[in-house]
Amino acid sequence: MSHLFSKACQYFPGGVNSPVRACRAVNITPPIVARASKEVFVDSLDKTFIDFCGSWGSLIHGHSHPKICTAIRQGLERGSSYGLTSEQEILFAEEIFSYLGLETNYKIRFMSTGSEATMTAVRLARGITGRPIIIKFLGCYHGHADTFLQEKPFSHTSLETLDLAHPLTLSLPFNDFPLFQTVMNSLGHKVAGVIFEPVCANMGVILPVPGFIEGVIQTCQQTGSFSIMDEVVTGFRVAQGGAAALYHVKPDILVFGKILGGGLPASAVVTPKDIMDHLAPEGKIFQAGTLSGNPLAMIAGKVSVNLCREQGFYTQLATIEQNFLSPIEHMIRTTGIPVTLVRYGSLFSFFFNPNRPNNLADAQLSDIEAFQKFYQSAFSKGVYLSPSPFEASFLSAAHSMESLDYAQTALIESLEQVFSLV
């Protein structure tokens, strides 16, 4: 254990301020970051890592992008927080509406975290419908509110005394539309909203089967329940317009975060006006935040989104993904090792399972011990993947060919080592 991490353990539970950072799922001592730039970070022991976590997908442009850093420095001279509506909020809202192609009958509410945004989405759904039940899907993560922490691996982090929240939340298997439809046929009149990730990133990368997302939204329309699409991960990453644009759907409520803040804390709820105007002060459903719409986060976010709009940005990202991951897929296929590499829109996951998972139960069939050995080998070579078998890793526009070539070789060698192919 490093000296700094030992000191961190004196002050923070588990030495961290968010559980997965402790790296217990991969059985390593977590690095303590000293600095970061582009696609790499350097730890307190002066070891350099190629970063495929990127602040959990927030840094699609890499660490310390010069345009974002310059904008933040200039903005800081005008103040770090006002507690009042700022010009920066309005300018950023205009940028988002233009980027997403939102119609004029939409509105947005800025917040600071994804958890705040999903909590607000659920509060809107319950407040407007007067119904108690929220449906989510097993393995999908929507923040740390008790409403969402119903099943393992999250339930142990929620106080047992708050189990009263659980009867108001139903968790169903992802991608099982017949079961979802059966439940909605029975309980739909009590369901305020259904929240879902369009592409799962918190049980590894799991894609929706054809028709699942569309079916969920259509069923919500039929029962008068709100469809809540959590695009905290996929928004601004998988395409301009996010997953909603890719799947050609219009959920009632959209939730954004991560990339939205350009590396600073920012999130947002986006809905048609007739939904959003139920929020205070226009309506009676309360939501507030001291740092909501923080001017520095708005500035960083505006630059981040503007960079995503540059000509060929997503084509470049797709090329990076293809060049980096295709040779690894080829190695897995030709050697016949029991590993499945799932990728989508610059997200990717290694499942130590010969079959592509469709839900949490499938993902949990993976060989966790083999994943740990693979992860430890890659880590020792200076390749930092997201430190859990059930978390997505991320590519960024900042990943250079040199870094990708090195990491590709390191990951293939690590797979060979785990399965004794060398």
Swiss-Prot record:
It holds the Pfam family Aminotran_3. GO terms for cellular component: cytoplasm. Belongs to the class-III pyridoxal-phosphate-dependent aminotransferase family. HemL subfamily. One of its GO terms (molecular function) is glutamate-1-semialdehyde 2,1-aminomutase activity. Its EC number is 5.4.3.8. Disulfide bonds: none annotated. The keyword Transmembrane helix does not apply. Homodimer. The gene is hemL. InterPro entries: 4pyrrol_synth_GluAld_NH2Trfase, Aminotrans_3, Aminotrans_3_PPA_site, PyrdxlP-dep_Trfase, PyrdxlP-dep_Trfase_major, PyrdxlP-dep_Trfase_small. Pathway: Porphyrin-containing compound metabolism; protoporphyrin-IX biosynthesis; 5-aminolevulinate from L-glutamyl-tRNA(Glu): step 2/2. Its main location: cytoplasm. This is Glutamate-1-semialdehyde 2,1-aminomutase. Its cofactor is pyridoxal 5'-phosphate. It is found in: Cytoplasm. Keywords: Cytoplasm, Isomerase, Porphyrin biosynthesis, Pyridoxal phosphate. GO terms for biological process: protoporphyrinogen IX biosynthetic process. It catalyses: (S)-4-amino-5-oxopentanoate = 5-aminolevulinate. The keyword Cytoplasm applies. It is an enzyme of class 5 (isomerase).
